[in-house]
Amino acid sequence: MKIVMAIIKPFKLDEVREALTAIGIQGLTVTEVKGYGRQKGHTEIYRGTEYAVSFLPKLKIEIAVASELVDRAVEAIAASAKTGQIGDGKIFVYSIDHAVRIRTGETDSEAL
């Protein structure tokens, strides 16, 4: 079992969700986050004053998947989130030691 976590541009959420649904991913968690990397940020003008925007709005998507689905999930996210511009995001994969479905008590792969 693995967690696939991706940081993406907010306007790409629907495309990513559709791509994951197409490969059989049944659920995901989305969190609004802010951050920066190579993109660094930008400046904006508000009421005639220039402001430096260091942290850019992004979305963090997390999905719990069986190990055999990880590569397909990563490929689906990468293909659907890509714009070809700096700031497209990152994908991270890490292991789950134990999972429990609270409602039924099912554990590990049955809980996914």
From Swiss-Prot:
Keyword Nucleotide-binding: yes
GO molecular function, one term: enzyme regulator activity
PROSITE patterns assigned to the protein according to its UniProt record, in alphabetical order: PII_GLNB_CTER (PS00638), PII_GLNB_DOM (PS51343)
Keywords per UniProt: Nitrogen fixation, Nucleotide-binding, Phosphoprotein, Transcription, Transcription regulation
Cited SMART domains: P-II (SM00938)
Gene Ontology annotations of biological process type: nitrogen fixation; regulation of nitrogen utilization
Stored SUPFAM superfamilies: GlnB-like
Top-level taxon of the source organism: Bacteria
Any single GO CC term annotated in Swiss-Prot or TrEMBL for this entry: cytosol
Keyword Endoplasmic reticulum on entry: no
Modified residues (O-UMP-tyrosine): Y51
Subunit structure: Homotrimer.
Record's function text: In nitrogen-limiting conditions, when the ratio of Gln to 2-ketoglutarate decreases, P-II is uridylylated to P-II-UMP. P-II-UMP allows the deadenylation of glutamine synthetase (GS), thus activating the enzyme. Conversely, in nitrogen excess P-II is deuridylated and promotes the adenylation of GS. P-II indirectly controls the transcription of the GS gene (glnA). P-II prevents NR-II-catalyzed conversion of NR-I to NR-I-phosphate, the transcriptional activator of glnA. When P-II is uridylylated to P-II-UMP, these events are reversed.
Family (UniProt): Belongs to the P(II) protein family.
UniProt cross-references to PANTHER family, sorted A to Z: NITROGEN REGULATORY PROTEIN P-II (PTHR30115), NITROGEN REGULATORY PROTEIN P-II HOMOLOG (PTHR30115:SF11)
Protein's name in the database: Nitrogen regulatory protein P-II
Species the sequence originates in: Rhizobium etli (strain ATCC 51251 / DSM 11541 / JCM 21823 / NBRC 15573 / CFN 42)
The organism's taxonomic lineage, starting at the top: Bacteria, Pseudomonadati, Pseudomonadota, Alphaproteobacteria, Hyphomicrobiales
